[in-house]
Amino acid sequence: MKKLNKKMVLIVSVLVIQCLGIWTLWGNTALKVNEYKILSDKIPEAFSGFWIAQVADLHNAEFGEDNEMLIELLFQTDPDMIVITGDLIDSRQTDIEIALDFAGKAVQIAPVYYVTGNHEARIPEYAELKMGLTEAGVTVLENQKVQITKDGESITLMGIQDPSFRTDYLFGDAESVSRQAITSLQNKSDGFTVLLSHRPELFDLYVDTGVDLVFSGHAHGGQFRLPFVGGLVAPNQGFFPKYDAGQFVEKNTTMIVSRGVGDSIIPLRINNPPEIVVVELERK
């Protein structure tokens, strides 16, 4: 009987380990789509029902051959605009061809706008990446803004370069660099303003500068998501990050933080599947 019990314990243990392994693998490869709706009386009538898809932190990840799964899911969301919020490549295993192939396919779905992350700031190939993105039809925003026009009305899209291009990644004054970039672009006539910025930890700055909607990433959802707690760790926020994933609202500013689709120094997600974010604008 004791031998039988030991055998059963061993079998159950193996099955549990296998199930956990399958669940973890699935959780790292099963792409999700998460939708949000933004209501504002500043949104022009022409942009009510305007859909924005966000891809964050690709880090050279591939979902299917030539990222066909990611592209197909992005296509199914039927966006009016696609935004890429940094870390399209990974500085530890840089392959700009994966990034450019993805971008070239994404622009066939909708207009694509891109800002850098901290990983782009680390690679010597960034100039080559930027040129390739531009040639593919992607609009690269480096402390720049554009007017998005529809039916005679417009919203303002701003994109700031990751502060790592001008400061030390861990110890530089990212807030002052980003503040200068944002305020240099702002104008009272901008109307409803969307900001692309890689760094969610700067949310107080975005609120202070009065931006209406921010798309961000960088936190990877906190990497390991604990029930009833949230993310465990995120770059530039440390343990139990406040801005790990989801929607954050303060005053008149809303920030959407994507969990991202790829990984970097920690090549594992737990209870934190990769996601595409889709946001619908609606006039209130």
Where do the PLM segments sit?
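Membrane-embedded segments
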Residues: 46, 50-144
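Catalytic metal-binding/acid-base residues of hydrolase active sites
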Residues: 59, 89, 119-120, 145-146, ...
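Beta-strand-turn-beta hairpins that frame and shape the catalytic cleft
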Residues: 39-53, 138, 145-159, 249-254, ...
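Binuclear metal-dependent hydrolase catalytic cores centered on His/Asp/Glu-rich metal-binding motifs
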Residues: 131, 135-138, 150-193, 203-204, ...
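Short, Asp-centered acidic motifs that coordinate Mg2+ and/or phosphate
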Residues: 80-81, 113, 138-139, 155, ...
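Conserved beta-sheet core of the metallophosphoesterase superfamily
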Residues: 104, 199-277
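Extended recognition/assembly regions associated with phosphoester-bond processing machinery
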Residues: 18, 22, 34-39, 181-191, ...
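N-terminal membrane-anchoring alpha-helices
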Residues: 1-46
